[in-house]
């Protein structure tokens, strides 16, 4: 008998006009550029949330920032622009793996990634899948780390 929770489900959905925060168990992944400009679209209507996220981008200098607020949990990810040197498929796959590693043990089961470009979504999804693979079948001492992440949605 197979355990369905060991598989990571990846869905691609149509982007909505506003950020849907009805899912309390979801982490919203938003991208911003190296010049601290928010790249993810679809939530500018909420001015308070938009300014809150922009302030967190400016304050934190790291590439991955987890922000919790009353409107939800957000992972702010710094990434290169398509025209930048080093923006390759390998870069996006590593970015996806780093996103997975940042979120795998924080207790949320759903991740919503806000990126409109299909090719970028494809490479990030591959990176998430590669990052989610564990070698537990080949280890003598199995890890006790609990992974709760089981659903990734690209919007």
Language model features: what each stretch is:
Residues 1-155:
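Short amphipathic alpha-helical segment within the helicase RecA-like ATPase core
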């Amino acid at each position: 008998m197979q355990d369905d929770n060991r598989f990571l489900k990846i869905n691609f959905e149509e982007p909505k006009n506003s950020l849907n925060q009805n899912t309390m168990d979801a982490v919203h992944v938003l991208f911003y550029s190296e010049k601290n400009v928010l790249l993810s679209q679809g939530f500018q209507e909420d001015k308070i949330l938009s300014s809150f996220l922009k302030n967190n981008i400016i304050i934190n200098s790291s590439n991955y920032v987890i922000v919790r607020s009353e409107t939800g949990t957000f992972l702010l990810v710094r990434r290169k622009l398509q025209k930048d040197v080093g923006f390759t498929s390998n870069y996006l796959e590593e970015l996806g793996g780093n996103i997975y590693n940042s979120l795998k043990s924080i207790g949320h089961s759903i991740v919503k990634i806000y990126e409109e470009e299909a090719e970028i979504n494809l490479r990030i999804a591959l990176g998430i899948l590669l990052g989610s693979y564990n070698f537990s079948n080949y280890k003598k001492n199995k890890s006790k780390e609990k992974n709760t992440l089981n659903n990734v949605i690209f919007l």
